[in-house]
């Protein structure tokens, strides 16, 4: 697999290099997905597989042989002994005893704990588990252990950062116990600070409190940075405030967007280059950690390249319909603290007269006004409704006020709302004659039976905040079918619906029969409001008044609507969490010409809403056996995307999203093929596996060949 990666990067490891900058880095995401298969030696030479503790949910995996293990051990001893001394010392380990019945609770921490035992003359474990499997700090046990030690014998307290804080430090602070370690004792902790982000405790306060509880100086509390992908290489804190790279390591900082090497003093993603790994391609690893290289010498005379960790690259925001696959479709029930009901109503668009003082009274007044307009709306010809929507769609495209929505699906919406297209939809939905919406007409192929399509009445919409444009598709169809509409928008709406609806004001449309419809009058049948999810009574009022309920959003959002009381004959339409994928049958790939037309359609589907909407696929399954192979179709697709981008411009991409695209490309550099723009505006990823992959967003399409659909 690494050979394939090098070929993809046009790198020949057998040719001389002029700088380590030329070595293509492997992103940590590769070890999360492919770690077990990334062996550089025959599998029979592997002795074990190491996994990270997976603070991000998916553990990294590296496979180890005897040579790698020996190198790791030597590197670790050299670095750590400089900070705690070369002589073995008693180790007070703040974790589960791997020999105990509770060893399963130790999990992936086992490898890290046992790795430090080579520095120990005596070991005690002081994290215990009760009968329910809950961990607690054994205060009495550690006191007894310290009491038995020779007088003045320095010790080393070792543990993971979050365990030291959650189980040890908190337990001591909540009690009257104070421990007094002998002079020269150290506290070393590993694992990083990610699990403590919610605690909002600074490193300085952590060191100070921990030192006070154990009776040592804060300078003797040492945070050791390291990562599974290069196990054995440790970077302890120096008194200067930096970490030092040993003689085994070269550190680079790369720009989060361009991946170019940065000079000292510039903040970037840290890359570590080392000869230590022998059994897997972990010699050049690009981490998700953000840091700064320092080019000045250490004031304490310590050798080695200096760097500081300033944080971790944030994950790209999940923006899909209902947060697609955000938890692999496993939703955990979360208890919500009971909050006092909110009665505030924000009326964002309503052309009627407001009545009432409280939020509930005003909402009831809006509902009554909308229902009063229902008879008028039912008298409007469907041709007039379609015509005026078509005119407004042109305005959405031409008016600069709506330019901020063009890269969020407005172009697609405007084309979809063309009068000819809406007539086609109405004809198909109304048995071939859209005038069934207007009056009783003969049933098809019958002179005795008549048919008329009646509107339901009040349609209430609960809109999502991530892809507002999608909600307009449902609204337009509700208007054409002569329903009055009440929209409850998201707190993230930022006035999008108010702006879109205001475009109707001042527009008129006259049918061929001479009937004129004013957009302002039509907008008297629509209202837009916002109230919080804690405004339970208003949610129940809106739901109980609806003949149609349309809910958009994630599981929690749509479940909230579903739990509201409703009329017995109310129709509920849910656009909740969805998996978005596309399928191409072999018959559709009968020629290069057919494939090019299809590739254009696929690229448009991916680009509309920038994959934030459920209409945009993230995975594409292509049936084998066509004239055009799945891999060739990817090549054609790569030719189509730039043309589509010219039509549907790519919106701003955050550094976090660009990093996510880089990571996904890095994985496929190992296991498949990658096509994509240099600006990360689109990406096609191809591999032989056919599993449904987690969305990356930002026009990243994962293509899978399959034998049969």
Regions found by a protein language model. Give the residues of each.
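Active-site glycine/GP-rich loop and adjacent strand/helix microenvironment
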Residues: 2-4, 104, 116-378, 383, ...
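Residue-level preference for alpha-helix termini and adjacent loops
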Residues: 4, 10, 22-25, 30, ...
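N-terminal Rossmann-like NAD(P)+-binding subdomain of aldehyde/semialdehyde dehydrogenases
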Residues: 8-13, 20-23, 332-456
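Generic macromolecular interface patches on structured domains
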Residues: 12, 62, 82, 86, ...
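Active-site phosphate/ATP/adenylate-binding loop shared across adenylate-forming ligases
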Residues: 18-222, 227-230, 234-241, 246, ...
């Amino acid at each position: 697999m690494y050979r394939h990666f090098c070929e993809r990067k046009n790198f020949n490891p057998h040719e001389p290099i002029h700088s380590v900058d030329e070595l293509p880095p492997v992103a940590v995401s590769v070890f999360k997905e492919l770690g077990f298969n990334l062996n550089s030696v025959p599998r029979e030479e592997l002795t074990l597989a190491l996994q990270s503790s997976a603070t991000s949910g998916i553990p990294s995996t590296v496979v180890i042989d005897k040579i790698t293990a020996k190198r790791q051990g030597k590197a670790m001893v050299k670095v750590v002994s400089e900070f705690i001394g070369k002589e073995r010392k008693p180790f007070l380990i703040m974790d589960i005893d791997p020999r105990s019945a509770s060893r399963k609770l130790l999990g992936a921490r086992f490898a890290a704990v046992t790795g430090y035992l080579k520095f120990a003359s005596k070991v005690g474990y002081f994290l215990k588990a009760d009968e329910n499997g809950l961990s607690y700090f054994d205060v009495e046990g550690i006191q007894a252990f310290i009491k038995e030690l020779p007088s003045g014998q320095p010790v080393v307290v070792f543990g993971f950062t979050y365990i030291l804080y959650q189980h040890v430090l908190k337990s001591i602070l909540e009690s009257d116990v104070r421990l007094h370690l002998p002079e020269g004792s150290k506290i070393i902790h590993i694992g990083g600070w990610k699990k403590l982000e919610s605690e909002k405790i600074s490193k300085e306060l952590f060191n100070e409190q921990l030192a006070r509880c154990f009776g040592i100086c804060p300078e003797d509390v040492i945070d050791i940075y390291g990562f599974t992908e290069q196990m054995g290489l440790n970077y302890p804190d120096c008194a200067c405030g930096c970490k030092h790279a040993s003689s085994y390591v070269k550190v680079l900082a790369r720009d989060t967007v361009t991946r170019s090497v940065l000079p000292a003093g510039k903040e970037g993603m840290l890359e570590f280059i080392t000869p230590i790994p022998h059994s897997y391609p972990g010699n050049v690893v690009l981490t998700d950690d953000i840091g700064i290289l320092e080019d000045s010498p250490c004031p304490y005379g310590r050798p080695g390249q200096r760097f500081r960790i300033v944080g971790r690259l944030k994950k790209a925001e999940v923006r899909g319909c209902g947060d697609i696959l955000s938890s692999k479709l496993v939703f955990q029930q979360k208890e919500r603290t009971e909050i006092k009901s909110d009665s505030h109503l924000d009326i964002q668009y309503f052309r009627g007269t407001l009545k009432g003082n409280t939020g509930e009274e005003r909402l009831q007044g809006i509902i009554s006004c909308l229902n009063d307009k229902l008879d008028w709306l039912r008298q409007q010809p469907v041709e007039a409704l379609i015509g005026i929507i078509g005119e407004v769609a042109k305005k959405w495209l031409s008016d600069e006020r709506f330019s901020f929505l063009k890269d969020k699906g407005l172009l697609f919406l405007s084309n979809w709302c063309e009068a000819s297209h809406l007539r086609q939809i109405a004809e198909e939905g109304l048995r071939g004659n859209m005038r069934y919406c207007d009056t009783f007409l003969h049933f098809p192929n019958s002179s005795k039976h008549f048919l008329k399509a009646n509107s339901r009445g009040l349609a209430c919409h609960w809109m999502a905040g991530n892809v507002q444009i999608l909600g307009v598709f449902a609204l337009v169809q509700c208007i054409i079918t002569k329903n009055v509409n009440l929209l409850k928008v998201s707190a993230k709406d930022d006035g999008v619906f108010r702006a879109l609806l205001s475009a109707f004001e001042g527009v008129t449309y006259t049918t061929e029969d001479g009937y004129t419809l004013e957009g302002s009058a039509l907008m008297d049948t629509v209202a837009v409001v916002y109230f919080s999810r804690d405004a339970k009574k208003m949610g129940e009022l809106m739901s109980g008044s609806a003949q149609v309920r349309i809910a958009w959003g994630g599981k929690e959002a749509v479940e909230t609507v579903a739990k509201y009381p409703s009329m017995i004959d109310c129709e509920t339409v849910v656009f909740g969490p969805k998996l978005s994928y596309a399928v191409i049958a072999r018959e559709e790939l009968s020629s290069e010409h057919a494939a090019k037309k299809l590739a254009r359609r696929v690229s448009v589907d991916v680009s509309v809403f920038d994959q934030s909407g459920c209409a945009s696929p993230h995975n594409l399954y292509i049936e084998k056996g066509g004239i055009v192979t799945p891999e060739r179709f990817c090549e054609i697709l790569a030719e189509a995307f730039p043309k589509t981008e010219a039509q549907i411009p790519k919106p701003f991409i955050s550094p976090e999203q660009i990093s996510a695209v880089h990571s996904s490309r890095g994985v496929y550099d190992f296991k498949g093929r990658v096509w994509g723009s240099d600006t990360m505006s689109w990406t096609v990823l191809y591999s032989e596996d056919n599993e449904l992959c987690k969305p990356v967003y930002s026009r990243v399409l994962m293509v899978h060949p399959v034998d049969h659909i």
